[in-house]
Amino acid sequence: METRFGASPPYTVGVEEEFQLIDPRTRALTPKIEEVLAAGDGELPEGTLASELSASCLEVRTPAYASVAELARALPALRARVRRLAERSGARLVSAGAHPFSPAAEQPITGKPRYRKVDEEMGWPARMQAIYGLHVHVAVPGGEEAVRAVSALARHVPLFIALSANSPFWEGRDTRLASVRAKVFGLIPRSGLPPRFASWEEFVRHVERLVRAGSIRDYTFCWWDVRPHPKLGTVELRAPDAQTDPGRTAALAALCQCLAAAAEEFEPEDPLLTEENKWRATRHGLEAELYDFSGQRTVAARRAAEELVGRLLPVARELGCEAELEGVLEISRSATGADRQRAVLAREGSLKSVVDYLAEATA
């Protein structure tokens, strides 16, 4: 398997943010991806903008940065440029895990052969994927380091979901979940928590078996919550909902970077209990009670976030992301994105008002 591990300095970081494209009049999703991509041609560095499965989704990719502080400074300006491109194309930009009311099955699939094939092979689950995530990439030196980082991140996927929860509504209904995206994404094959790999070679053998079986064409068809990405030389965290506030994006990126760098400090944990924690975080967000492996106790998600940040602060100082990691504390002490969306609905009485709030807050 071709890899680029070690091609970049270790623990450089970049993100991919998936944005909703919104009709300014109806506030519904609008399939304007081709118009936005055309508007961005020559305006932004090649590869910055990309399509995804849904034609109402715009993926925005940052370059790799030496520090999360650099990423944090770049994100607002990049979002502003992309927002202007969307507006020129007749769309508004929204960052949240799911649209409050647009029916998922009505969203057209993009014309990319990859996604046409996915639609053909999966059927209904593919049509439900009108969801929007934050992906964090952290460069690692080699395959073994990638496997260890995946393991360390996997045990903390529930906490990432709790911190990022930003999708309470689905097709006009309050799901009573903090992250409906986490459940909808689980409809597709090879999603959810990653298998536990003892070595890089075991990961390679697993992918090769799936290729020989005709299940996948390459490892990028394994859509786990966190995975090695050898073509980029990174580990990729895929669990968080898209964040309305770019400051929260930076905070989650810092947490991911620190965990990847400190991976050897975290032993693999019982996947069944991690799955249970993931459900609790999906349902309750930061109000969840999570099983704490180290203390064999139940701990509030907010407290778990504070304890993890405290443990990682020495690593953050070495990486230069202490301020951004402390942003996780700010998230843990405030309302989630899901809470804020519900508050807007309670105050305004309209899901269109929720869309307006999200569009205005997507800074």
UniProtKB/Swiss-Prot annotation:
Molecular function per GO: ATP binding; glutamate-cysteine ligase activity
Pfam families xrefs: GCS2
One biological process term in Gene Ontology: modified amino acid biosynthetic process
Catalysed transformations (reactions): L-cysteine + L-glutamate + ATP = gamma-L-glutamyl-L-cysteine + ADP + phosphate + H(+)
Documented EC number(s): 6.3.2.2
Keywords recorded for this protein, A-Z: ATP-binding, Ligase, Nucleotide-binding
SUPFAM superfamilies attached to this UniProt entry: Glutamine synthetase/guanido kinase (SSF55931)
Thylakoid listed as a keyword: no
Functional note: ATP-dependent carboxylate-amine ligase which exhibits weak glutamate--cysteine ligase activity.
Protein name as catalogued: Putative glutamate--cysteine ligase 2-3
Naturally occurring in which organism (per UniProt): Rubrobacter xylanophilus (strain DSM 9941 / JCM 11954 / NBRC 16129 / PRD-1)
